[in-house]
Amino acid sequence: MAVTPIVGQKIIKNLRFRSSQTIISFISTINLLELRKMIKVKVDLVRAIPLPPISLKKGPVPICPPNRKVKNFFNKIGSTIEIKNEKLSINFWSTSGMMASYYEILNVMSTWLIKKGIKRSDAQKYITTLFLALSEDAVVNSKKDLRHLVKESQTPKGLNEQGLREMSKRGTYKSVVNTLNKIYKRLNK
């Protein structure tokens, strides 16, 4: 089921399901208990979070609860992460709510370059490929604590040290945590 929560609230109770079905819900704010009440038939029910980059066959797909058929399906188009309980899955839903914020960072940096006289195509190519490379580096190093990359990317009195210090002073990273907490609170009703 891939509809908005408002549409889901309206239509799910009117749909007919069979007990032999496996139902996958992409609906962010309707939990498993609510879905089961709306569906009224005992089915295999899984919540999943496939984000737009899955169209490129890239990215994680958290699923809850674990389900072999659903995992095998999503492993063909991404990287499935099985979450044992719904309470923990809310953390993944919360972080997925930061996708637009990530794109806005890219937009702000590209726009800044454009205002400095760089052609839009060059600005966007530079920023997007820079962040792609940084993300790939983070994936390669994902078994290490990510603070390692923060430390390794700075040189004493260097530009990255300055950038990190300025953003830390302004509470940028605390704001990220506060935003995640607000999204989590909305989902954890």
Predicted segments, located by residue:
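Rossmann-like NAD(P)(H) cofactor-binding subdomain of soluble oxidoreductases
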Residues: M1-I63, N67
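Transmembrane alpha-helical core positions of polytopic small-molecule transporters
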Residues: A2, M99-Y103, T155-K157
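Short coil/turn residues that cap or connect secondary-structure elements
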Residues: V3, V7, I27, G97, ...
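An acidic, carboxylate-rich microenvironment
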Residues: V7-K10, E34, D122, D145-H148, ...
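Internal alpha-helical scaffold of NAD(P)-dependent oxidoreductase catalytic cores
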Residues: E34-D44, G59-W93, G97-K143, K182-L187
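Short loop/turn and capping residues at structural boundaries
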Residues: I49, K84-N85, Q124, L164, ...
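NAD(P)-dependent Rossmann-like dehydrogenase/reductase catalytic/cofactor-binding core
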Residues: T128, L132-K189
